[in-house]
Amino acid sequence: MSEADVTARGDAALLGPAEVRALAERFGVRPTKQLGQNFVHDANTVRRIVTAAGVGRADTVLEVGPGLGSLTLALLDVVDSVVAVEIDPVLAEHLPRTVADRAPALAGRLRVVRDDALRVRAADLPASPTALVANLPYNVAVPVLLHLLAELPGLRTALVMVQAEVADRLAAEPGSRVYGVPSVKAGFFGTVRRAGAVGTQVFWPVPRVESGLVRVERYVEPPWPMDEQHRRRVFEIIDAAFAQRRKTLRAALAGWAGSPAEAERRLLAAGIDPTARGETLDTAAYVRLAAQA
């Protein structure tokens, strides 16, 4: 969907710095590092996130870690259904009230699920989401993203804000310095690219690191099987290859294959140089290798 197709209704009163702090004080909320809580307080930033997500009224958007509701309100201006998953019981309780106060005409479009995004299943959600749009808790951003892409096959896109370094890793190309496990595993589900940068001053409390936007477009026609059993086989090989990053694949995959010789045989059968290192292979190569097990 093009940016021109995204038309905000403008019914929500978005949160600014004063409103964010006032809500936190009213609810007795103190952001914790344990939950990776940094609340966005800049209206232009949340509008930019929604625009970059490319969502429209027909989408059901999954938001993880809505916090005080900054991004939630901006999403409700554009889509007719938002499912917000929040682990913090206080924030989960107050989010519907905040939306009712600041966007009364849109409050019926929000459903809140109090749960851990690392454990949530499709059956736990009141609707099947088509898009993930979230300021992910930075301490668990990659596991949450991969879990949701695996658990919710109806997600056609994901637009997430993560630590800038993590954004670079997710969108990295084979052979680059930061290419690693997150890059390969995210590439199993779809195409991944950086979608922008976000500075520190739009958050409260101000984080020590810059943030980045990452967009995942799920494959319309998957180039390989997407079932859980196949995914686990592929991910097992990825983990083994990067556990000993500086070793050749022949050596790094010896434990997985049973011996260096068997690892070499499987690598050659998959059309992969046994002396290569894991950081040089794209996701498709790992999928080919899994077929040799």
Swiss-Prot record:
Protein biosynthesis: present as a keyword of the record? no
Can you cite an annotated GO cellular component? cytosol
Q: Name one Pfam family in it.
A: RrnaAD
- What are its E.C. numbers? 2.1.1.182
Q: Name one GO molecular function term.
A: RNA binding
Q: What is its main location?
A: cytoplasm
Which residues does UniProt assign to the signal peptide? none
User: What InterPro entries does its record include?
Assistant: KsgA/Erm (IPR001737), rRNA_Ade_diMease-like_C (IPR023165), rRNA_Ade_Mease_Trfase_CS (IPR020596), rRNA_Ade_methylase_Trfase_N (IPR020598), rRNA_adenine_dimethylase (IPR011530), SAM-dependent_MTases_sf (IPR029063)
**Which residues does the annotation say bind S-adenosyl-L-methionine?**
N38, V40, G65, E86, D116, N135
Q: Which UniProt keywords apply?
A: Cytoplasm, Methyltransferase, RNA-binding, rRNA processing, S-adenosyl-L-methionine, Transferase
* Catalytic activity line of the entry: adenosine(1518)/adenosine(1519) in 16S rRNA + 4 S-adenosyl-L-methionine = N(6)-dimethyladenosine(1518)/N(6)-dimethyladenosine(1519) in 16S rRNA + 4 S-adenosyl-L-homocysteine + 4 H(+)
Compartmental location: Cytoplasm
Q: Which PANTHER family match?
A: DIMETHYLADENOSINE TRANSFERASE (PTHR11727), DIMETHYLADENOSINE TRANSFERASE-RELATED (PTHR11727:SF7)
Q: Which family does it belong to?
A: Belongs to the class I-like SAM-binding methyltransferase superfamily. rRNA adenine N(6)-methyltransferase family. RsmA subfamily.
HAMAP family given in the database record? 16SrRNA_methyltr_A
- NCBIfam families (alphabetical): ksgA
Role:
Specifically dimethylates two adjacent adenosines (A1518 and A1519) in the loop of a conserved hairpin near the 3'-end of 16S rRNA in the 30S particle. May play a critical role in biogenesis of 30S subunits.
State the protein's name: Ribosomal RNA small subunit methyltransferase A
Q: Specify the species.
A: Nocardia farcinica (strain IFM 10152)
This chain is encoded by the gene named: rsmA
